[in-house]
UniProtKB/Swiss-Prot annotation:
PANTHER family: PHOSPHATIDYLINOSITIDE PHOSPHATASE SAC1, PHOSPHATIDYLINOSITOL-3-PHOSPHATASE SAC1. It comes from the Eukaryota. It is an enzyme of class 3 (hydrolase). It is a multi-pass membrane protein. Phosphoinositide phosphatase which catalyzes the hydrolysis of phosphatidylinositol 3-phosphate (PtdIns(3)P) and phosphatidylinositol 4-phosphate (PtdIns(4)P). Has low activity towards phosphatidylinositol-3,5-bisphosphate (PtdIns(3,5)P2). One of its GO terms (biological process) is synapse maturation. PROSITE patterns: SAC (PS50275). GO terms for cellular component: axon; endomembrane system; endoplasmic reticulum; endoplasmic reticulum membrane; Golgi membrane; neuronal cell body; sensory dendrite. The gene is Sac1. It comes from Drosophila melanogaster (Fruit fly). This is Phosphatidylinositol-3-phosphatase SAC1.
Amino acid sequence: MDSREENAVYDDMNLYIAPQSFIIEPNGGDELLVIGRHDKVTRVQPASGGLVANLRPTRRICGVLGTIHLLSCDYLLVATHRLFVGVLNGAVVWRLAGYDIIPYIPNSFQRKENENYLRLLRQTLDTKFFYFSYRYDLTNSLQRQREVAQSRPEVSGLLQRAEQRFVWNGYVLRQFNCDKMEKFQLPLVLGFVSINQVQINGQTFFWSIITRRSVQRAGTRLFCRGSDEQGHVANFVETEQIVEFNGQLTGFVQTRGSMPFHWHQLPNLRYKPRPVLVPGKDHLAACGLHFKEQIRLYGNNVAVNLVDHKGAEGELEATYARLVREMGNPQVRYESFDFHSECRKMRWDRLNILIDRLAHEQDQFGVYHVFDDGKLVSTQTGVFRTNCIDCLDRTNVVQSMLARRSLTAVLQKLGVLHVGQKVEHASDIFESIFKGVWADNADLVSLQYSGTCALKTDFTRTGKRTKSGAMQDGKNSLMRYYLNNFADGQRQDSIDLFLGKYLVNDNEGGAVPSPLESKHGWRFFTFPSVLLVAVAMFMITMTYPAEFNTENLLFMLFWGAMIAVSATGILHYGVEFVQWPRLFPPISFRDP
């Protein structure tokens, strides 16, 4: 039997909600998953016992996502709807399109506080970029899948073989576990998947992109920067480019992640808060731990840093360069490229300077290449780890160029391209697909981290920078400003709750204060109120009849001064007007 069939997860089930238990029955299966609603004991038992003979299914589900404890009770999470994405190496890939949150024992205990937690839980599950497959391990690259199969052949089940860094419902799946439950546990990957059947030179092949976001140090743009004490970095993302052709598979992996030392850039109502190093932290230790893990996972690392060489970003760049030098690890090479300076005035052709610098190592690293029968041709021996300040816009541009160069080499080796032919010149149709997919990848990764689509995607989609693209970037930048200052605190709480970083205390709202309770000082209400009144009075004064010019002028000067004073106060105490995470607040306030 195909090992993927042995590890497959049930894809079509009936859910029965009985007074004492949840019963999940796979259609066509010979076993049941029984979850006690009172004792929370989980077991898998034969379907022949007649347990559901007299029951009517409550609903049909397409996946068991896990269970989570909130204030009033535990909740069962199930997938109810899915969207077809494509077929990858013979296995169907889906996107989560609907879910249900079902209480074990409904009650009204701490109802208000519990509803707040349910709202946070839904906010993460409502993300439209969760992907899954019942037979294909989306969490592992092709190369890791082979390594896992060889090093742990006795392990069965998609979740058990999965790369836990990329299992977004790993915490809620681990909350209930029992023997023989593997076929009921459906891992979710957050990121982006695109599967395309394409043709070049009359040869048909599948070209796919899989992007996986890490659960380690997961969060939002300005609340999650740099590294933690274990060397886990913010916005760490692995992207794999897969080619399937004529019984052969190739995979090319790249990574991105925040600069691996302790720094932050907390919102304060300024358009661009200054990023700063966190004082008193061991930056070298964090950087060393990070690259030790990256080398273990990927082999040699080329750290491609695209931040500015001047200003606040320049200070971070100098720190990163110094730390890599002090590490003295021959398996890590640092490559710095001031993206904005080099490509100013829309000279994006200068990116080829960077690609040329990386070409030798890219040829050395190679790609993973294997035949369907398991015959190994080559492995990828190193990785490009790219970053800019956000690891979004500039990073995606460079990654797409490295992916294109790798794809040219792969297709030449497979015989799809002629010797010396480049993929960007081989087919206008494929080039349009390639650019569109990488631009979509940029947008989705950016939406998950910053809340808006990526910047600079006009270059990725068209191959050149345009004025309309620059205008769209301006709109997205303004939207990022609003979300990062006034919405991302709750989004960060939602992520921390779903990933199990925060565990709900049953006494919250009673003996223990609820962390979700709003706490604001007097300035939070006073300055905006004064500003609102001052603006209103200023506008009213402007409508007065012209014969009262002197009096009008005095009124306008007074209310104009009040506008200036209140606006200055808001900016000066900007951190007090930001929506901060409440489960793990990065700072605290003390009103005088």
